[in-house]
Amino acid sequence: MDHRLCFDSIPDQFDKWRIHYSSELFEYLIRYAGIGEGVKVLELGPGTGQATDPILDTGCDYTAIELGKNFSDILMKKYGTRDNYNLINDDFIIHDFGDERFDLIYSAATIQWLPEKIAFGKTFELLKSGGMLAMMFLHGDYQSADPELYADIQKVYDK
C-alpha cells in the first residue's frame, strides 16, 4: 500500500482522534495571506477537512487535491454543495493543473509525505507571481496515561 494512503483506510478514526489546529493559526493565515473572495487557494491533502472550514468560509475560490478515495467521499459529503468548493481526487505528484495558478497553496501536515523536489518545485510552479506557500505541522509526542493505548497508536504510525 502507498504509505500516503495509510490514514485513508481509517477515515472516521482519523477524523475523531486527529489533533486539531488552533483557530488563531487560521486567523493569522487568513489575515497575512489576504484570503477572501476572488483569491484562488489550493489545499494539498485535506484528509477529512480539519484545516478546510476556516479557509473555505472566507469565500475564496477553494480547490483541494486529495489522493484518498475515502477521504474524498467524506469531503464531498461535507462541502460538495458549496459554490466555492472544488475537489480533485487525484495524486498531486502526477495531476496536471493545466494553466491554473493559485494565490495560496497550503498544506496541513501533508506536504512532508511528498518528495521534496515535487513538494516545493511543483507548488512553486502552481503559485501566481507573489503567491504564498503555507505549511502547517503538528508537533508533539502524545503520551497516553494508558501504555497499551500508546503502544497501539505507535503501531499505526509505524505502518
Where are these regions (language model features)?
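Conserved catalytic/acceptor-binding region of the Class I
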Residues: 128-159
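A short acidic, Gly/Pro-enriched loop at the edge of an enzyme's catalytic core
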Residues: 95-105
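Class I SAM-dependent methyltransferase SAM/SAH-binding core
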Residues: 42, 48-94
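Nucleotide donor/acceptor-binding cores
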Residues: 38-39, 100
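Conserved class I S-adenosyl-L-methionine
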Residues: 1-36
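A short glycine-rich, Lys/Arg-flanked "PGG" loop and its adjoining helix->strand segment in the class I
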Residues: 118-129
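A short SAM/SAH-binding and catalytic strip from SAM-dependent methyltransferases
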Residues: 104-117
